[in-house]
Amino acid sequence: QVYRGMDIGTAKATPEERRLVPHHMIDICDPDYPFSVAEFQERAAALIEDIHRRGKLPFLVGGTGLYVESVCYGFSFSEGGADESYRAELNEYADRFGNASLHEKLREIDPASAARIHPNDRRRTIRALEVYRLTGVPLSEHLAGQKKESPYECCIIGLTMNREKLYRRIDE
């Protein structure tokens, strides 16, 4: 929901909904901007602090589980930086052999991350492989050691939707 123009399939609040209730971090960057979970966490924490200062109750709505948990549990992101040449190599591999083959490489070194990341989510698959290459430690182990006592009083609610209904809604 942070990306401009990415409205289909994101359940992004409509302009009318945004007029009724203040929303933050919607349409804040272009789709080609590499918006990371660490940046999300930093921006969300600043907004939460600002909203609290104004005597209001913030709601963190939407996003992936990792993004929400990073804010609620104060994850620290020190998985070794980035390796652009390795990312390019993995992208070329996926272009040639497919996302499923790339995902299988992840399953071999980090079954827990592979179980959590969809085989077609190339970006997250590559990031998990990159973290392992840079640190020698699977991403799942990095994440397992990061959950802390929440700095906030959180109430986490998850919603699901019937798959057929979801696809119909996306098609509309």
Annotate each language-model stretch with its function.
Residues 1-172:
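Phosphate/pyrophosphate-binding catalytic cores of soluble transferases and nucleic-acid-acting enzymes
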